């Protein structure tokens, strides 16, 4: 299973095409729209989210609420397009309009300058329109489809915010996926710790007042995962590696870790490895989950626990020093409409990309042509691993 996305931030809209879904899987537009709505929320979002009310149009691959096994095409309209029709026109425009909203002063930390050099764009709007995090709208749409597939197989995904601007949630126990879903949805910053959430919101407000931005850390937990997804046989078959790639592919994300993550470097092996248990009721389990649900690049039946770190958004309302690519003189960087903090929304995007990789791994391991046989094979595999 794979997908491609297309579209610019201020173009007519965004498109994704998914190939490889099994036939007969239940899927409605509402399954996607509820995830798009979640992505638009969160304390710290900018004015753009008051304009866009994202709704998906499914244009291919579904009939009467079920997938056909053919490519699924989805489109999300940009409501703000009406204000950008000339600037972002697909057809040629009069010469006097060609330089409207031209960007020649790249923003530090963004794709502007390097993208311009790579593709020869002397108007870096051609770069920023595609590199914008607006593209994650259709990544969330694709992830919503993956989450639906996983849900039907008894696998659930939830994300939440662990840290914003140096304030970290004080979590003294592990949370079930259902708890994470319920508690995070009730928080303006998608945080499980109400006290920390208040401090996070204050830091976001302070950053906005100062024309600055702040980043943070999100965590995604996947429960109900069968053992044996991914493989140790080749480096590029390891599922944790694929998930790590997916996490750092999200706009502004700079790192990923599983389980205790980088803390493992400061602990002896006896405090990191997860002891193996067995019972007739549950089969093989682990006493702890320090490795985040992975051993040898494969799922071990414990919940997947992965975290990603998001840098502060590079668009600053008090811009940093840059250079005009025309004159080579020093100027302040360009300013585009932006959020002061998008970490809460990014947790939804992280859910989507993790769900996608897990769904792909499921379809790689089991027959993926028909959804009814897929469900049967997953259940048979669960029983086999339990009886091993």
From Swiss-Prot:
Its EC number is 4.2.3.5. It catalyses: 5-O-(1-carboxyvinyl)-3-phosphoshikimate = chorismate + phosphate. This reaction introduces a second double bond into the aromatic ring system. FMN binds at residues 130-132, 251-252, 296, 311-315, 337. This is Chorismate synthase. Transmembrane segments: none annotated. Residues 95-118 are annotated as: Disordered. Pathway: Metabolic intermediate biosynthesis; chorismate biosynthesis; chorismate from D-erythrose 4-phosphate and phosphoenolpyruvate: step 7/7. It holds the Pfam family Chorismate_synt.
